[in-house]
Amino acid sequence: MKILLLRLILCLTFQGIFLQSSFALVDSNVREFLENRVNQWPEIYLTSFKFSDISKDLIYPKWFEGSWLVTSQDIINDSEEPVIYKVNFFKNYSDVIVGNRAKNSESIGKAIFGDTLIKVVNDPDSINNQITYLKDDFYIDSRITERNQIQDDDIFFADELVIQTVHKPGASRVNQVETISKFQKCDSEQLEINVSQKNDICGFQYVATYGSKVGDPSIHAIKTNKYKLTFKFIEN
């Protein structure tokens, strides 16, 4: 019996080591994939997201928890005024930090569309679907079809592909948008002044628009944008 128990323990131990090695390998592959996407930008093509997993929401490092004021500056068109909005990240039932998708999208939408925005609604059956309602019977149906991210306590690095269908009376238009996000704590001395204050978060978003040819894996981006983002902590 003792020999059998020992063999079982050894078997479970080896399985655990194998799983950890497998997760580390996948994470390494995803990191390489994401770095390649950033390096290819802006001469970027729609690709196969072979490590994609849309069964889980984006998970953020613990230091993202709380509410933040975001300033997003278009680097390509730096003459444009920055877009400023609030976002919130919270600990979900699985004890991981996720974004408040509807609230955050609505906040960004208000900053972009102003009073034209009516509301943003999440699909109760899927974390990947969302509808943005605008005035004059105008609405945008957004579906996340691909998602890659690495798990790293020091950085948030992810890539999502969204199919957006814009509906307005008498017409509809499909567009594919890829957003690569890379954020980390800013280099800052602010904690020396106030130890209770969280570090600002800094980073970039690389956005590529591919048009309406859904399913074609070799489309060149028809439009690219790069944004510099700064998050300033508001409250928990």
Where do the PLM segments sit?
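Short helix-loop boundary/capping segments
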Residues: 124-218
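Active-site acidic/histidine clusters and adjacent loop/turn architecture
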Residues: 114-121, 127
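Amphipathic/hydrophobic helical signal segments and adjacent flexible N-terminal regions
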Residues: 21-67, 71-113, 209-236
